[in-house]
């Protein structure tokens, strides 16, 4: 029976080496003796020896046992490996089915979702628009195709869990077995012995992405547009996540949006309000002629049908709500003052203050049916 070499000697480290030093030594030797890279006849045997040494020395509990008892372990029974994972179910499986029971390994993980805030104008929100955006995301490494391993090599079986993706430990009391995800391979069952130079073993690289986003008519601020598959790439070749484009509509100089209705304040002077007039009212599509009857009051509301924002999930559009604002002059010349004084005398017997004023916002609520 061949005598096993000292594990510290195999990795070329001191007995008081730190975990970081042990890990660096393992990576260096694994790269040197990996069978896909080193074609020497004894390369595979040396690679297995390096994996075995690292499996023990990278685990504090196994390393402590090895430091105390060496290869034999505390119970030097022939054929007994004190550093093998305690898995009573595995031996039963092998007895009946001639195979090895493997722990449940995680499949490819989906990449993270990303968010992008897209600023658009008021008009673009009403009519819709196509915008080209540019953002950064993680993409699958083209060199290793997401595996993380140097091209021409493959990930190797995890030396800590033996490829199970989990660690089984027998509790000293109650004869129970606890199962935890392997912290070395993170449940994948394999580790990267020779990392890809392009992505440094990550399997992904950060790239700039440029795409065209179609913004539908009638969209409003805080709306989200989901673009499938445009988020980050998943680790180890996993599928891409989604990109969520969050809409930010810039305010308009004089239009205010309320749901699918568009509100406009229309300033009128005192004469126009008293005598009535015809005015060209600006809308999102141009101007509309609006008749203002004589005696219109401040805060009066007029509705122009079908001149609001389109409904997102159905046909039709909202309305434009025109709210009258009577502007009282503040600087009168002598002639205007005399005219107002004469008007005031003629209105001395007219009742005032006996009408309930609902206020500006009250009138708008009534117009909107709120």
Swiss-Prot record:
Chief localisation class: cytoplasm
Record: residues binding Zn(2+) 1: 141, 144, 196, 199
Pfam family, one: DnaJ_CXXCXGXG
Keyword Transferase listed: no
Cofactor names: Zn(2+)
Entry-linked PROSITE patterns: DNAJ_1, DNAJ_2, ZF_CR
Keyword NAD: no
Record key words, sorted: Chaperone, Cytoplasm, DNA replication, Metal-binding, Repeat, Stress response, Zinc, Zinc-finger
CC per GO annotation: cytoplasm
Domain J span(s) in chain numbering: 6-70
Compartment(s) of residence: Cytoplasm
Residue spans of the CXXCXGXG motif repeats: 141-148, 158-165, 182-189, 196-203
One BP term from GO: DNA replication
Positions annotated to bind Zn(2+) 2: 158, 161, 182, 185
Cofactor note text: Binds 2 Zn(2+) ions per monomer.
Zinc finger (CR-type): 128-208
Molecular-function annotations in GO: ATP binding; heat shock protein binding; unfolded protein binding; zinc ion binding
Quaternary assembly: Homodimer.
Family that this chain belongs to: Belongs to the DnaJ family.
Its job: Participates actively in the response to hyperosmotic and heat shock by preventing the aggregation of stress-denatured proteins and by disaggregating proteins, also in an autonomous, DnaK-independent fashion. Unfolded proteins bind initially to DnaJ; upon interaction with the DnaJ-bound protein, DnaK hydrolyzes its bound ATP, resulting in the formation of a stable complex. GrpE releases ADP from DnaK; ATP binding to DnaK triggers the release of the substrate protein, thus completing the reaction cycle.
Entry domain remark: The J domain is necessary and sufficient to stimulate DnaK ATPase activity. Zinc center 1 plays an important role in the autonomous, DnaK-independent chaperone activity of DnaJ. Zinc center 2 is essential for interaction with DnaK and for DnaJ activity.
Protein name per UniProt: Chaperone protein DnaJ
UniProt organism field: Roseiflexus castenholzii (strain DSM 13941 / HLO8)
